[in-house]
């Protein structure tokens, strides 16, 4: 099965399990590293996830994936929090994390550039609003290739 199909199937199977546990499915990754395959599922909830949350989701997903067997190779299943530099994947993330510092990369230039680091203001319609270098700017959500929270000390 192609990588994209694997990710799509895993997300479809994982989402109800994660939601049933009162958690958010942040992201799913399938990667080959050092000759080994890894399926990583990132979960979160307000206040952060506990090891018990990860264990619960891991056990349920492991059983479901064993039944479906979508991945022909042997792989390691990892379930964890997305970390303090979590990716911002959904429009709602920019509302939830308003006031936080983020790094954003766009598919094509916005106001002449593709990389931005600034404070998230929120969403305005379909645009992410950020305070970048003392100036408020709007970045179309559909133009965002990747975005992550930045660690502040």
Curated annotation (Swiss-Prot):
> GO biological process annotations for this chain's record?
ribosomal small subunit assembly; translation
Q: Where in the cell is it found?
A: Cytoplasm
* Entry's Gene Ontology cellular component terms: cytosol
Keyword Nucleotidyltransferase: yes or no?
Answer: no
Tagged with keyword Ribosomal protein: no
Q: Which residues form a coiled coil?
A: none
| Main localization (coarse) | cytoplasm
Q: Tell me any Pfam family this protein matches.
A: DUF150_C
- Kindly state which keywords UniProt assigns to this record, in alphabetical order: Cytoplasm, Ribosome biogenesis
The similarity comment for this entry is:
Belongs to the RimP family.
The cross-references to HAMAP family, in alphabetical order and at most eight, read: RimP (MF_01077)
Biological function: Required for maturation of 30S ribosomal subunits.
What is the protein's given name? Answer: Ribosome maturation factor RimP
